[in-house]
Amino acid sequence: MTVVSVEHALAGKLPEGGEVTVRGWVRTLRGSAGLAFINVTDGSCFAPIQVVANDTLPNFDEIKRLTSGCSLIAKGVLVKSQGKGQSFEIQASGVEIVGWVEDPLTYPIQPKPMTPEFLREVAHLRPRTNLFGAVTRIRNCLAQAVHRFFHQNGFNWISTPIITTSDAEGAGQMFRVSTLDMVNLPRDATGNVDFSRDFFGKETFLTVSGQLNVEAYCLALSKVYTFGPTFRAENSHTTRHLAEFWMIEPEIAFADLAEDARLAEQFLKYVFRAVLDERGDDLAFLAERVDKKAISKLEAFINAPFEQIDYTDAVKLLQHAGKTFDFPVEWGLDLQTEHERWLTEEHIGRPVVVTNYPEHIKAFYMRLNDDGKTVAAMDVLAPGIGEIIGGSQREERLDVLDARMAQFGLDKEHYSWYRDFRRYGSVPHAGFGLGFERLVVYVCGLSNIRDAIPYPRAPGSAEF
């Protein structure tokens, strides 16, 4: 018995007339004059394969009762299909039914249009749909391409801790990790919670970024990256925010902001090319049902050189855009999505790297420029979504870093280990961060980031 994937069976690389076995789930079934036409999918590709069963099979009456979602093993002869829209089909010599759908009428995944809102309520079943099957395969393709890009370019992957004592962003929006009894918290002499009696002997949190930790390895191995889960306790009920998501954070030694921007451009174009090359079937479906530009926007992105513009110049352009924005445009304020999209879509028409932001709106670790008013920071903006990458050259001068930490009200003793990098062989270095789900949203043309991750975590929502 040669078990093959549906993708392999449809690819035309197996001998026609050979015996094959496929295992999967029923997508649809229709009957006609002693025949049953079963569309079977195993998730290996977008298209199902048609299994043709005739009434000479001993369990044909049972086969006719199959419904969407039932699981089976079908064996038979692989032949060229006579029908339209598929290359090969299986003339079944046997169909073993492995699992029935208990009540087809109440089965949530029906062969009809279903809204993303409804499917979020049954997130454990939504990968069975065409949409989320496609999104999941594209997400996997992107993840594999991320690791492949960095591996091919000499980077080392670093596993940074999920449990941490440091706030890399300085925003204070962190999830606390504790084994203390919340009903009977231990108190110290001042009445505050005594975290010395907690599991780690101090306050600990879920990480908001692996950047500070990965810098340590950058300053020993030169080119590193981390790719893992991060957590933000932002009470944001928007289509752009998750409480749990994955971050890609490379870091390069002996590098400035210009090199950081080049790395970001090379990286994005590489992973987009991988999706176009490997997941054309899923992109074609998304272009038909979700975002008609799903393919063309990636091709345009890859072929366009990035435009670089200073933040100060971007503000001037926006102020003279002849357009009324919902959010004010003023030097010293961060750019909003509407501003970013105007720059990329209406003014420049391709990806944009905005550099040198005001120092007070960016993180403490970003390198202070000579003007004393801006930092060597960048945001990569993409048409259709706005910011997709944020990065900077890191502050390698200890005295300047200490001053920046004081400005942000951070205890430098708490960050003594991070300061050590500037005390022992400090070098210029840079890096960036990219929310993986934002990448998935952009590629798939999704309208809500909660559809870009298998089990979304958001304020008031932690199902499954």
From Swiss-Prot:
Keyword tags: Aminoacyl-tRNA synthetase, ATP-binding, Cytoplasm, Ligase, Nucleotide-binding, Protein biosynthesis
InterPro entries, A to Z: Aa-tRNA-synt_II (IPR004364), aa-tRNA-synth_II (IPR006195), aa-tRNA-synth_II/BPL/LPL (IPR045864), Asn-tRNA-ligase (IPR004522), Asp/Asn-tRNA-synth_IIb (IPR002312), NA-bd_OB-fold (IPR012340), NA-bd_OB_tRNA (IPR004365)
Record family assignment: Belongs to the class-II aminoacyl-tRNA synthetase family.
CDD domains, per the entry: AsxRS_core, EcAsnRS_like_N
Domain of life the protein comes from: Bacteria
EC number: 6.1.1.22
Subcellular location(s) of the protein: Cytoplasm
GO molecular function, one term: ATP binding
PANTHER family: ASPARAGINE--TRNA LIGASE, MITOCHONDRIAL-RELATED, ASPARTYL/LYSYL-TRNA SYNTHETASE
Reaction equation(s) it catalyzes: tRNA(Asn) + L-asparagine + ATP = L-asparaginyl-tRNA(Asn) + AMP + diphosphate + H(+)
Protein name: Asparagine--tRNA ligase
One GO biological process term: asparaginyl-tRNA aminoacylation
Subunit: Homodimer.
Cellular component per GO, a single term: cytoplasm
Taxonomic placement: Bacteria, Pseudomonadati, Pseudomonadota, Gammaproteobacteria, Lysobacterales
Keyword rRNA processing: no
One Pfam family of this chain: tRNA-synt_2
Main localisation: cytoplasm
